[in-house]
């Protein structure tokens, strides 16, 4: 699932991707990287992330993104890499508490 929307720089919104089956996904890195005009996301909080090991650069440089669905409910137990996950994002973005204090920018 990595890099699906990477560099879609004119993408403003997405269709409903909330019901995507992510049960066996292990990599979500660079998923929305460089989607500079993306200003909202569907409710991706329903995604099953229990097998995901890499979320690096997932929302990197999503400069117009002003809010996230409640991804604090995701399962991060197997996550090994999350470097720069929110790098270049608005400092007003509602970052989940799991990432507060981490080097993620």
Feature names for model-found ranges:
Residues 1-105:
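Negatively charged
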């Amino acid at each position: 699932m990595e890099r699906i929307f990477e560099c879609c720089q004119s993408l403003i919104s997405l269709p409903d991707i909330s019901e995507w089956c992510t049960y066996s996904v292990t990599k979500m890195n660079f998923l929305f990287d460089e989607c500079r005009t993306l200003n909202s996301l569907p409710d991706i909080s329903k995604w099953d992330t229990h097998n995901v090991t890499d979320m690096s650069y997932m929302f990197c440089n999503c400069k117009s993104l002003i809010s996230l669905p409640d991804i604090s409910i995701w399962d991060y137990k197997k996550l090994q890499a999350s470097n720069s996950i929110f790098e270049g994002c608005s400092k007003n973005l509602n970052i989940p508490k799991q990432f507060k204090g981490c080097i993620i920018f």
